[in-house]
Amino acid sequence: MTETASGPARGSRAKGTKAKGLRIERIHTTPGVHPYDEVEWARRDVVMTNWRDGSVNFEQRGVEFPDFWSVNAVNIVTSKYFRGAVGTPQREVSLRQLIDRIVKTYRKAGEDYKYFASPADAEIFEHELAYALLHQIFSFNSPVWFNVGTPQPQQVSACFILAVDDSMESILDWYKEEGMIFKGGSGAGLNLSRIRSSKELLSSGGNASGPVSFMRGADASAGTIKSGGATRRAAKMVILDVDHPDIEDFIETKVKEEEKIRALRDAGFDMDLGGDDITSVQYQNANNSVRVNDTFMKAVEEGGKFGLTSRMTGEVIEEVDAKSLFRKMAEAAWACADPGIQYDDTINHWHTCPESGRINGSNPCSEYMHLDNTSCNLASLNLMKFLKDDGKGRQSFEVERFAKVVELVITAMDISICFADFPTQKIGENTRAFRQLGIGYANLGALLMATGHAYDSDGGRALAGAITSLMTGTSYKRSAELAAVVGPYDGYARNAQPHQRVMKQHSDANGVAVRVDDLDTPIWAAATEAWQDVLHLGEKNGFRNAQASVIAPTGTIGLAMSCDTTGLEPDLALVKFKKLVGGGSMQIVNGTVPQALRRLGYQEEQIEAIVAHIAENGNVIDAPGLKHEHYEVFDCAMGERSISAMGHVRMMAAIQPWISGALSKTVNLPETATVEDVEEVYFEAWKMGVKALAIYRDNCKVGQPLSAKKKETEKAEVTAKTEATIREAVEKVVEYRPVRKRLPKGRPGITTSFTVGGAEGYMTANSYPDDGLGEVFLKMSKQGSTLAGMMDAFSIAVSVGLQYGVPLETYVSKFTNMRFEPAGMTDDPDVRMAQSIVDYIFRRLALDFLPFETRSALGIHSAEERQRHLETGSYEPSDDVDMDVEGLAQSAPRAQELKAVATPKAEVAAAVPAPKQAHTSAELVEMQLGIQADAPLCFSCGTKMQRAGSCYICEGCGSTSGCS
């Protein structure tokens, strides 16, 4: 591990004296070799389009990245983090420039503020930091990439907590401060409970407005600002204590707005998120949370009364039924996903600095919780980078390397506070005084699956808890070592006793944690040692940081690290999209799936079969050879085997005891969930010691896409009404005419020579490029004969019928088995006997253009299928048979797909939607499940976003609604 310059002698140092500096140990780098020289670099073109209209919304060609970086990561880092105007000499064109801009700034600040024992240690620090960023081992939060090393203010914090008092001056300052934070690329939250309620009087004698009314102004301000100027939307949180007299109005704010959205949508307005008309609705730019205390929750449990208190006097001015109020919270969350819930007593029980004030608020995603007017800078580790896998099922977690990287990152994060700029003087003073950090991780869901652990299992929770305990224990250990070198945080002296108490709570929780298997046991052992060091070094040196860890959504930075999963989320699905370097994309089965199967003891042949099944079906149900007890390992956030709501809550509870702050997490519920289900989640999370959470019931928001089932139902209702109206109004003037679909000038075709009963001929079958058979030409050997003439006429009639929509299977069923001469033997191995030329022609067309199920029902099989029937008793092809012909050319429209076309004399046009194409993994899941994920479209590129903690992240371009 990293040591101080005084080495072993530091134990004899007089208390209060400082060590000379940190000795930085190499983790990954080689002396005399720069990390950039150890990788292969490649030039890439980044062209990002808006899927809605095809327009190019970002383009930069010839950027330089390591060749192992994914296309998606290159696109996101280039478009989000490269600085300078595109096309100017100031624009960054290489990842080297970006990383150098950051690590050199950190090194210089570390030297200026006396962190390192020598220039050699400073150089090792720079190289190790560069290596870790280059190899996507960790990432700072987005503001670091946006701002550090640029001429603009060096804002490094992603998370801010503001404060507002019961005065107009303070309220207007709140609006201004939020705007400045959004401008710097970050998010902010605050508690409004100090503002007097609408049930209390002003000094002038009138009634107060109440906090809900002032939320309107802040919401409107946030809606006009893009975070970071151009790359992110504003993210904000508003909180109200459960004992505030206006709590019911607060709970119902978004429910009432959702009702407005429904009415406006039904009236024809564009109410999708990002739509032109959604901005007319209030309270859409913030997450709302109710701060509940143990007194309230116990009253809910016991069915008692609960008092709402005056903001001015603290007296109870109204009593309410606690269970009814709790029910209203659950009903509102069920209806529109707000409000979330925060557990005040749990939060403050783990507070390291209670002598300096209570924890009242949180950042927008609810993972940072500390004093008012403070900030936290985040960094997240890519957990999959620490999984050692020999490819044969033997795995281990690299405990020592993980701890060393944590020490490196904590050191860098603390250095950044020294040179950072802050949006307000109060936030700057408080952050420098308490130096809150938020180290966390991403890819937990991928790690659990890769190691054969179900997300909702004792083994999965044990592994997640062990890693979290080691991370936070190592972070506080490094914080104590930093305190020995550059001193503890300014507020430590006043809060030394409660800080030590919280460290003891973390250590005690580690001591009673359950060890499950060979993966988590050595991690727990290392964590135990780390916490022992924390208690010893902290008592001697104090701590450099009031907080050390959070679990953030890791939206943009998770994609920049090519993570499969964000924060502590499980995997979205087993099949995802991978962008290709040359353009385009392909569907792939998660690489964690074969890793998990090897860990579970499956052989390579079995793994190939299971992966092939997943590729085809999107899930593991009925996968060949997969044991039923292993199904749970592959459970995901969406799909037929999705993780239950309480499975998410149990994972949060397994991690929370070793996190300084909280966890950004939304518990997803199915559309069929009840209000009682929401109540259960909120109540059990309190019992389990979770600090905060939010729920999201699929399709609860009108401003987001409905499920396919709902859309079809509504469309059917509208269509039925419309058709009835049309029939009544234009019945006498409607003419029913078929519509001909002509083939293009160039069309694919198959020419087949044949002999039937000695008569020779040729058949050319041409098809639409994407929609099956469109015409047939028949030529018999003797030109001018009656037979040849009849075949010409017959082929024209059939071709015209196909183009007017007559299904091919209708022709096949009518003309096969028709008897006339010539008949007899053929030279076609698939059709050995034909009762006529027409019989042969349509049997051949069926084999070439109809799917197996359709022609099998007509009794038409190939020679290979007949042989299979003799051997196995079944005509059906096995899973590994390549169905080239059927995949290439499907038949003309089948009978069940054929619909009457009414063409009124008045011009009536029906839009025919193009086949849906998926552009992201979220959209791919929708296509596989036949439902739509309830998530907004990205405001930058138009693709479907996906959940990341309590925020949304766009897999296509990296835009996020959160703050990481």
Swiss-Prot record:
Query: What is the catalytic activity of this protein?
Result: a 2'-deoxyribonucleoside 5'-diphosphate + [thioredoxin]-disulfide + H2O = a ribonucleoside 5'-diphosphate + [thioredoxin]-dithiol
Listed GO MF terms: cobalamin binding; cobalt ion binding; nucleotide binding; ribonucleoside-diphosphate reductase activity, thioredoxin disulfide as acceptor
Spell out the disulfide connections: 159-376
Alphabetized UniProt keyword annotations: Cobalamin, Cobalt, Disulfide bond, DNA synthesis, Nucleotide-binding, Oxidoreductase
Query: Is-annotated flag, keyword Disulfide bond?
Result: yes
Please give the Gene3D superfamilies that the UniProt record associates with this protein: 3.20.70.20
| SUPFAM superfamilies registered for this protein in UniProt | PFL-like glycyl radical enzymes
Q: Please note every region of biased composition (Basic residues).
A: 12-21
> What superkingdom does the record give?
Bacteria
Q: Which positions bind substrate?
A: 142, 158-159, 187, 363-367, 553-557
Q: Name one GO biological process term.
A: DNA biosynthetic process
Cofactor binding, note field: 5'-deoxyadenosylcobalamine (coenzyme B12).
Disordered: annotated span: 1-21
This protein's cofactor list reads: adenosylcob(III)alamin
Q: What class of enzyme is it?
A: oxidoreductase
Main function: Catalyzes the reduction of ribonucleotides to deoxyribonucleotides. May function to provide a pool of deoxyribonucleotide precursors for DNA repair during oxygen limitation and/or for immediate growth after restoration of oxygen.
Q: This chain belongs to which protein, by name?
A: Vitamin B12-dependent ribonucleotide reductase
Source species: Streptomyces avermitilis (strain ATCC 31267 / DSM 46492 / JCM 5070 / NBRC 14893 / NCIMB 12804 / NRRL 8165 / MA-4680)
Traced from the root, the source organism's taxonomic lineage reads: Bacteria, Bacillati, Actinomycetota, Actinomycetes, Kitasatosporales
